[in-house]
Swiss-Prot record:
One of its GO terms (molecular function) is calcium ion binding. This is Annexin B11. Residues 47-67 have a biased composition (Low complexity). Keywords: Annexin, Calcium, Calcium/phospholipid-binding, Repeat. The keyword Nucleotide-binding does not apply. It comes from Drosophila melanogaster (Fruit fly). One of its GO terms (cellular component) is vesicle membrane. Residues 138-149, 165-181 have a biased composition (Gly residues). Belongs to the annexin family. It comes from the Eukaryota. Annexin repeats lie at residues 204-275, 276-347, 359-431, 435-506. InterPro entries: Annexin, Annexin_repeat, Annexin_repeat_CS, Annexin_sf.
Length: 511
C-alpha cells in the first residue's frame, strides 16, 4: 500500500516525541529527485528567491475582541504554552533542505530537450535511493526497524513505535511530558490509508513494453487494447522507464506518437499517465490558472489534500517548468479569504508528527468556536491557522471536541460562517481529515453527476489516486451513492476511454 495522506514531515518538530511513519509521496510510481541532480540551474544561472513575509500569517497568540462573554472558565495555563505543541508558521525558508532553491537573483528558463528525461529533472527511472525502509531525508535519519521503545515510558508512546521510522533526535523523553502537567502528549498509530488499484507490474521489461507499444502504433490503424494493457497497468515510475527505452530504441517520443495515434479523452488520459506525476500536478495547476478565469476547484482539490513534501516538490518543479513561483501565481489569481487560505496551504507548514494532545485539542475547539459562532462576523485567520497547521490526528480530536461542545459538526459551522471558495476549501480539509476516500469519491461523483461529464476532473482523480487508495475510494463511492464506480463510468464514458478507466480502477472489461 502506498498511502498519500498527511505525508512526510518536511522538518520534524523539535518538541515532538514521536513521528508518524512517513508515507511515500505521490504513491507507488514517484521517484524522489536525486539530490545531486537539482532541478535548479547552477549558481551561474541564478533565479529569483522569495522570502516569506512575516506579515503573511496570523500570530499564534492572537487575542479575540470583546463581545459575547466567554462561556468557558478561564484556562489555568495559556495556549499555546511556552513549549508549543505545534510548530509556528515558519520565519525562514519552508523548504526541506534537499528541495530548497538557492538564493539567486534571477531565474533562467531551462532549455527544452528532446529527451523526456533530462538529467536535471531528477525523475530518472534509474533513481533508486530515497524512500525505502527508513524513509531517510538524506541525513541518515531514517533508521528502518529497531526503534521501538516498547511499553512503560509513561509518555503515551505505547503504540505506534513498532514502525521504527524515527528521526533519532526526536525521541527525547526528557521534555517534561507526564511530569505533573496533568496531561501527556500521546502518539497514535499511523493511519494506514490506501489500497491502490495500479501497482508496479511484476516481471517488468521496459524494452519489451516499448517494442510492443511501437508495434501497436506502427502501420495502418492502432491497437488501442495493447496501449491500455501496457500504459494503464504499469506504475508511473515504470511508464517513465518505458518512455526512455522507446526513445532509445526508436528515436521517437512516445507521448508524441500517442498524440498522433489517439484522440479525445482517450488521448488525454494516456498522455496524463505518461507524464511524471509531479509534472502532471504542475500542469493541472497551471491549466487551472491559465487564461480567463480560474478553476478554483482544482486548486482546492490539489492543495488541500497533499502533504508538505508533496507541496514543496510541486512548488520547486512548477518554478522550473513555468518560470514562476506557484505562490505568486495563486495570489494573482485569487483574492480575499480564499487567497489567504491557499497561501497558508502553499507554505506547507503543517505539523506531521502524528502526536495528539487532548488538552490542546479542547483549547483549539474553543478558539474555533469563539472565532466563529460566538461572535459577530468570523475571524477566518484562526480557522486558517488551526486547519492548515495541525496534524490530521490532532484535527480529528479537535473536530470531536467541537462537536461535543456544540452538538454539531465543525463542517456545519463552516457552512454557516463562510461562503464561496474559502468555504469549499475549509470543507475539503475537514473531509480529507475525517475520510479522504469519501472526499475523492464525492469528487468522482460530481464529475459524472447531472448532464454531461467533467472528464478533466474524472481523469485527474483517477490518475492521481490509482496508485494510492482507489480501492478505498471505490468502496466509499458505492457506500455513498448506492451504485458501483464502474457502473457510473459505464454510463458516462464509452469506447477505449471507458476501457482504460476500467483498467485504472481495477475493474474487468465487461462491454
Amino acid at each position: 500500500m502506498y498511502p498519500f495522506g498527511s505525508g512526510m514531515p518536511s522538518h520534524p518538530p523539535t518538541s515532538t516525541n514521536h513521528h508518524e511513519p512517513p508515507r511515500a509521496p505521490f504513491g507507488a510510481g514517484w521517484v524522489p529527485p536525486m539530490q545531486q541532480n537539482s532541478p535548479y540551474p547552477p549558481p551561474s544561472q541564478p533565479h529569483p528567491h522569495s522570502q516569506p513575509s512575516s506579515q503573511m500569517h496570523p500570530q499564534q497568540h492572537q487575542q479575540y475582541p470583546g463581545g459575547a462573554p466567554a462561556p468557558y472558565p478561564p484556562m489555568s495555563a495559556p495556549y499555546p504554552s511556552a513549549a508549543p505543541s505545534y510548530p509556528p508558521y515558519p520565519t525562514s525558508n519552508p523548504y526541506p533542505a534537499q528541495y530548497a532553491p538557492p538564493a539567486h537573483n534571477h531565474y533562467q528558463q531551462p532549455s527544452v530537450s528532446n529527451s523526456p528525461y533530462p538529467a536535471d529533472r531528477g525523475y530518472t527511472p534509474a533513481m533508486t535511493a530515497g524512500y525505502d525502509a527508513g524513509y531517510g531525508y538524506g541525513n541518515g535519519q531514517g533508521h528502518g526497524q529497531g526503534h521501538g521503545h516498547g511499553q512503560g515510558h509513561g509518555h503515551g508512546h505505547g503504540q505506534g513505535h513498532e514502525y521504527g521510522h524515527g528521526y533519532g533526535q526526536g525521541y527525547g523523553h526528557g521534555q517534561g511530558h507526564g511530569n505533573g502537567q496533568g496531561h501527556a502528549h500521546r502518539s497514535l498509530p499511523a493511519h494506514r490509508e490506501g489500497t491502490p488499484t495500479v501497482v508496479p507490474a511484476a516481471n517488468f521489461d521496459a524494452v519489451k513494453d516499448a517494442h510492443d507499444l511501437r508495434k501497436a502504433m506502427k502501420g495502418f490503424g492502432t491497437d488501442e487494447d495493447a496501449l491500455i494493457n501496457i500504459i494503464c497497468r504499469r506504475s508511473n515510475e515504470q511508464r517513465q522507464e518505458i518512455q526512455r527505452q522507446f526513445k532509445t530504441h526508436f528515436g521517437k517520443d512516445l507521448i508524441e506518437d500517442i498524440k498522433s495515434e489517439t484522440s479525445g479523452n482517450f488521448e488525454k488520459l494516456l498522455v496524463g499517465l505518461l507524464r511524471p506525476i509531479v509534472d502532471y500536478y504542475c500542469a493541472e495547476l497551471n491549466d487551472a490558472m491559465a487564461g480567463l478565469g480560474t478553476d478554483e476547484e482544482v486548486l482546492i482539490e490539489i492543495l488541500c489534500t497533499l502533504s508538505n513534501m508533496e507541496i514543496n516538490t510541486i512548488k520547486n518543479q512548477y518554478l522550473r517548468l513555468y518560470g514562476a513561483h506557484l505562490e505568486s501565481e495563486l495570489k494573482s489569481e485569487t483574492s480575499g479569504n480564499f487567497k489567504r487560505l491557499l497561501t497558508s496551504l502553499c507554505t506547507a507548514a503543517r505539523d506531521e508528527s502524528g502526536r495528539v494532545d487532548p488538552v490542546a485539542a479542547k483549547n483549539d475547539a474553543r478558539e474555533l468556536l469563539k472565532a466563529g459562532e460566538l461572535r459577530v462576523g468570523t475571524d477566518e485567520s484562526m480557522f486558517n491557522m488551526i486547519l492548515c497547521q495541525r496534524n490530521y490526528q490532532q484535527l480529528k480530536l479537535i473536530f470531536q471536541e467541537y462537536e461535543g461542545m456544540t452538538g454539531h459538526s465543525l463542517e456545519k459551522a463552516i457552512k454557516k460562517e463562510f461562503s464561496g471558495d474559502v468555504m469549499e476549501g475549509l470543507i475539503a480539509i475537514y473531509r480529507c481529515v475525517t475520510n479522504k476516500a469519501e472526499y475523492f469519491a464525492s469528487r468522482l461523483h460530481k464529475a459524472m453527476a447531472g448532464i454531461g461529464t467533467n472528464d478533466t476532473q474524472l481523469i485527474r482523480v483517477i490518475i492521481t489516486r490509482s496508485e494510492i487508495d482507489m480501492t478505498d475510494i471505490k468502496v466509499a463511492f458505492e457506500r455513498l451513492y448506492g451504485k458501483s464506480l464502474k457502473s457510473w463510468i459505464k454510463g458516462d464514458t464509452s469506447g477505449h476511454y471507458k476501457h482504460a478507466l476500467y483498467a485504472l480502477v481495477g475493474e474487468q472489461r465487461s462491454s
